[in-house]
From Swiss-Prot:
The keyword Cell wall biogenesis/degradation applies. The active site is at D359 (proton donor), D380 (nucleophile). The gene is PME3. CDD domains: PMEI-like_4. This is Pectinesterase 3. Acts in the modification of cell walls via demethylesterification of cell wall pectin. The lineage of its organism: Eukaryota, Viridiplantae, Streptophyta, Embryophyta, Tracheophyta. GO terms for biological process: cell wall modification; fruit ripening; pectin catabolic process. Substrate binds at T306, Q336, R448, W450.
Amino acid sequence: MATPLQPFLTKTHKQNPIIGFNILTFVVTLFVALFLVVFLVAPYQFEIKHSNLCKTAQDSQLCLSYVSEIVTTESDGVTVLKKFLVKYVHQMNNAIPVVRKIKNQINDIRQQGALTDCLELLDQSVDLVSDSIAAIDKRSRSEHANAQSWLSGVLTNHVTCLDELTSFSLSTKNGTVLDELITRAKVALAMLASVTTPNDEVLRQGLGKMPYWVSSRDRKLMESSGKDIIANRVVAQDGTGDYQTLAEAVAAAPDKNKTRYVIYVKMGIYKENVVVTKKKMNLMIVGDGMNATIITGSLNVVDGSTFPSNTLAAVGQGFILQDICIQNTAGPEKDQAVALRVGADMSVINRCRIDAYQDTLYAHSQRQFYRDSYVTGTVDFIFGNAAVVFQKCQIVARKPNKRQKNMVTAQGRTDPNQATGTSIQFCDIIASPDLEPVMNEYKTYLGRPWKKHSRTVVMQSYLDGHIDPSGWFEWRGDFALKTLYYGEFMNNGPGAGTSKRVKWPGYHVITDPNEAMPFTVAELIQGGSWLNSTSVAYVEGLVE
């Protein structure tokens, strides 16, 4: 049988054995050289070609190993990222039945609840990654920002799930799966950060009255009171509306609505827990005023867990809440008890009151904007890992339990490539009437780092005298003090002095406006592209 080398070894005339041996040696040497080129040089060239994709990864070698699973030699960065995300979707879909099986094997109701939360978060994450693939394909700056926001939310979802399971000692059952998903989410963010985007769009669009993702009709709605709005459905306890509970009205709202759907809730106290699921898009809930329409609940961590303890939760994109009070009345003795949890992208909370004690407002994930609202609490009462801006709000520390300290914020950013952070701008950070006379007995701080890359900036705001001179407090020892970013810029009031502030590597007294700009509506939440349509008042930059 002929061999591949036969043409080099066969002679039609008289064969010289020395020449034949030399030819054989040459061919073997050539074959070995080609082998080395293909199997040694080619991977090196791949690594050189695609190493930029992993340049912002915390573990670049691990990132490259993931990239090598799906890369082809002709793939550009965007194509590689898309293939990686497609595989990521499959992995999450495979994880869902694993978590569901474990849930069905557990009898403890609280543990089942934690696993139910994980299933919900995984389901949301599948959609967010799928949407990111479509956004990346458009190759524009605004869509790149969308993808970064959504993938940041995916990582937050996975970390939230792991936190929930860890609190019930369930992480060992799911830890391997979750650790893998968390790692891949971080790699996806690193790859996205390395993919260049066109410069043909400008995300900062000057001053306006809302981020760009708020339509002109939404603007008009947000300039109106509830009774003046032509609502799709009305909620009234006395039977004069379409429904007597908000939960019924939300459940009846159309799924995946592309236009604004308004539910008007008349004056009254509604004792219920409400969830605006991911399918309830572009939903607006409006009441008769923050002191007139009250939604109240009392779920808490003592009786369950933090994530589902909210009185109202919103996940559906484009959510608007206006002229309503959301409260959790569990009290300080019940520890974490959330009034409002928001994971809805491009959401607006306007002229609302949010009342509780510990963990009042869970700004969980995605882009959020709060305006002219009143938020009260004690420990970590604004927490989560959203990209969130508060403007013209009153942020009010209450009297905590004995031996407790007030923490205004506890930001939960876990990766430097996440486009998340808490920005408090043009706000009043003040003491409640019950705290004010005893504020020397209960210290109040601007925040503490919940996660390793915690990021919070307080700027152009009034800080009352209850703020401790050190300003910020550690979470545990020196955890995150080098990796966090905490900043203060142009604040005023008796608590605004920075001479006695903490000396952490990650703390910054900002003097350059350019350093403050990333925490504005324009840049942190790309507000110029979506708030315009809501009609809520806002400032996009640093100048009112």
